[in-house]
Amino acid sequence: MDFRIIARDASCHARRGRLRTAHGTFDTPVFMPVGTQASVKSLSPDELEDLGAHIILGNTYHLLLRPGAERVARLGGLHRFMHWNRSILTDSGGFQVFSLARINRIEEDGVVFQSHIDGARHAITPETSMECQMQLGSDIAMCFDECTAYPVTYEYARESMLRTVRWAARSKEAHTLPEQSLFGIVQGGVFCDLRRDCLERLVETGFDGYALGSLSVGESKEEMLSVLEAVAPGLPAASPRYVMGVGTPEDLVEGVRCGVDMFDCVMPTRNARNGMLFTVRGGIQIKNSRYADDDRPIEEGCSCYTCRRFSRAYLRHLFLARELLAYRLNTLHNLHYYLGLMAAMREAIEANAFDRWRRSFYLDRENREPAEE
């Protein structure tokens, strides 16, 4: 992996970079569409590439349970399995274990849990997480960590953070695939001193990149922003900085302001399937009756396939009729919006105009459409 900073904005910590993996180069800050089960829901790999996606995320937990990492390896690895020739980042499985599965035990060795699919009992340790991610063959792997819940006491957050640090060291020791980069994950809940302590310890171990985990897990926006502002700028400047599972367009803008390079979130794809579509002025719920006779596209001037061809009225009809095309068209638009948002921020940073761009971004959102019915 090679990561280089191309430009910095003088008004804040925002930075424009370029990251090269074994499967290509992409510009940062970047948004990674989530391909939970070796698929970004409703879209083909060719469509993702046409949208301008250069890296996607795969979920180790889901792929471990079905179809199994060993099977994916036998079939040539995740890139070949899903016919995606660009970069892939896999998470460690930690977040899904703590959010989806029924946990039986958290031990020093790892986590024993029951599958959310069939109730079968499994265990994930730092070593098995690394083995799975190496079998999948992603370009970037994540250390196995404990996803700290919210709310927790300071004492538990510290205990959890220290366990994550120990698991990170074991993850690094077990990781033996040279062409696959390994990122450490900074934990500590909403306690900024614990986050800084965790970061110091991870830097001592040494990783190719560093991520902030366990954000947007129930804490307030103010608490999340406080952690971002206090910790993100202190992540090693020469390494990629990643905030996991975040978030809204506003979250991405504030993350970039704080110096974050990489983001992933299910929001654009999940919201698309629920009929919530993103525009520069905010979100619209396409099922609302006000769009029944609306002949306009989702967003005037949007160049996505959906907006160039279809009206809000048609999209509303498809959604209410539960036509599969609704999910595809909505997803195409939402990912086009998210990827375009990142491109606009990269351009603003390169022009040393991020602060002005950010003010314009929020001004547009103040001019929302009238309240929906």
Curated annotation (Swiss-Prot):
Keywords: Glycosyltransferase, Metal-binding, Queuosine biosynthesis, Transferase, tRNA processing, Zinc
Annotated Zn(2+) binding sites: 302, 304, 307, 333
Catalytic residue positions: 91, 264
Gene Ontology process terms (BP): queuosine biosynthetic process; tRNA wobble guanine modification; tRNA-guanine transglycosylation
The record's free-text note on cofactor binding: Binds 1 zinc ion per subunit.
Region (RNA binding) location: 245-251, 269-273
Top-rank EC class of the record's enzyme: transferase
Pfam families: TGT
Pathway: tRNA modification; tRNA-queuosine biosynthesis
GO molecular function: metal ion binding; tRNA-guanosine(34) queuine transglycosylase activity
Entry annotated with the keyword Amino-acid biosynthesis: no
E.C. numbers: 2.4.2.29
Assembly, per entry: Homodimer. Within each dimer, one monomer is responsible for RNA recognition and catalysis, while the other monomer binds to the replacement base PreQ1.
Name under which the protein is recorded: Queuine tRNA-ribosyltransferase
